[in-house]
Structures are given as structure tokens and as C-alpha cells.
Amino acid sequence: MKKFLLTTLAALVSAALSAQVYTEASDLTLIGKIIDTPNPYHRVDTVKYKGFTKAENLQVRCPAGIAVLFRTDSPSITVKATGDFSYQANNTMRLASHGFDLYIRKDGEWLWAAACCPAPRNPQAPMDLIKNMAPGVKECLLYLPIYSELTSVKIGVEEGRMLQPMESPFRHRVAIFGSSYTHGISTSRAGMSYPDQFTRHTGIQLLSLGCSGNCKMQPYFAAVLEDVDADAFVFDAFSNPNAKMIEQRLFPFIERLQATHPGKPLIFQQTIRRERRNFDTAVEATEAAKQHMADSLMKIAVKRYKDVYYIKPSTSTPLQESSVDGTHPDDYGYYQWSRSIEKPLLRILRKYGLR
């Protein structure tokens, strides 16, 4: 009897899933893409752009910061995806690295709705994202995984229900190149990086090229940024390189981008304070040196170069307890970062007619 019930239940579940009608996400509206790529879920075309390390090559093929906009009246939404879901890290939840993160617009605000993650043993199986929604058309924003290379993402709605591309409500194209912080490492969900939170709260579209451990103002990343169609550029450029590297690379990096993007604002962020500095004297010395170097050189840069700016984010709480691992903030820390740069960044963008 028990076996019969389980078999019947499995058949019912299968029938329910088969009743879903699927649409490839790239046939809807993608936002957050920094540059066009043959695979719509890649951030950089690694056939065209060369020089990346093996780790960087994977990172730029992961869709961190890319999201899908669509409208549907379906009471339920499912997701099917194919790709490489092998990344593992102790400091980042699978819902962020492998998962899909849904927001729905309500009363003009993007409100969190649901998240799902591929099953480790059967990652290509359909995932129930959300069910039992009230009648009516929903405007949806679905973030893609931050650390999984995707070959296909299909969004499923109930048969007979509407699924349409949604015109993007996000304004402008502001590129952001950064470290694991910009990538979203240690977030709990795929849409919780500080660029994603900034975009939802301000309506200004940030195009993320966050690469964990690998934002060091490398010439081959500059080559990508030279080809990016953006209204402004933001950098989290002082988190990964040491003081000597900052000294050697900062001014050539600025000059190269100004040559290809004259008149566009280049906005550099100081790196945040890592809680590992609290008692580790070696980390304290290294971090203090690179922050001092960044402060010293940016003081010169903002005077030497037109359209170059310097802002300082913060993730601090009174007892510095927003850290996951001594390096990366948690979701609340990234929220603090997003809010701390909001006023200075918007003030700079307004100077260039970006409102």
C-alpha cells in the first residue's frame, strides 16, 4: 500500500511538472550584462578576450549580477537549468552560488518572493520556485547564480498562463568591476550583493564584473572594460591587490580607460575594513598598507585626472559583527555597503545627467 501511494504521488508530481510551459530566460529580458556574449549567461566572451587565469576564466563565465525580468499571471513558477554547479565554498550558501533568487514588484518596491537551488545529485531537474500566488499579473526579477556557469535557464509557468518579457525599469548602464565583495561572496542568496541591492533600491542599473580574488587592475580586464558601453564606471579596485601593485597599476589603469571613455566618470571605492585585522598583526599590516596606498594615490588622482572620483564604503556595525569569515560581510554588511555609497555615488552620477 505504501509503495502504491508513493508511486501515485510521484506520478502526480510528474504530471504537475509536465503541465508547465517553459521559456528560455534569454528570450525574456536580461539586465545586468556588462557586454554582449555568444552565451547570454556569460559576462565576458573568453574566446574573444584572452589572458585570464583558469579561475578568472570561470568567474567571467558565471552570471553573477545578471537577472531576468518578466511578467506572468501564473500562480506558480518553476525553473530548469543546465550548467556547471560544482563550485563549493564554506563561506557562501548554495542558494547564492548555485541558486535562483526571485523578487516581485509590489507597490513600486522590489519585494523578496522566493529562492530555489538545484539538487546536488540531479541539478537538471525542475525546481519549484514559488507556488500558490494570488491571481493577477506579477512583475518578476529573477537573479541567476553567482558562481555557476549556465548553458540554459528555462522559466516555467502553468499551461495557459502568460509569460512575457518585461521592459526594464532600471535606468542607465553603470559598469562595476570589483573583487569578491562585488561578486557577492558570502551572501545567502544570488541577489544580495551590494551592486544588486543598490540597483533595486535606486533604479540605477549596475553591470557587475565582480571576480572573487581577481580584481587587480589587470591589463586584460582593462581590455574588456575598454569595449564596454557604459555611462559611468565604478571600481572596487583596492581589495585584492597589495600596496605595491596598487602603486604600479593605478595610474596606467586610469589613463587607459580615460583614453577610450573620455568624459565618463571613473569612481573608485576604498576597500572595507576586514575583521581579521582585529587580532592578526600580519593582516593588519598588509591591509593598512594597501588602504594607505590607495588613499595617498587617489588624493593625487582626483586632482590630476578629470572625471575621477574616490568614495569610501562602510559595512560597519558597532561591534564589527557583520563579517562571515573575517573578510566578507554577510547580507546585512552588504546592505550597509550599498546604502553607504548611495548618496555619494548618486551625487556624482547627477553631474553627468544620470538620474
Which ranges hold each PLM region?
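Positively charged n-region of N-terminal signal peptides that target proteins for export
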Residues: 1-4
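Histidine-centered active-site loop/cap adjacent to the catalytic His
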Residues: 324-355
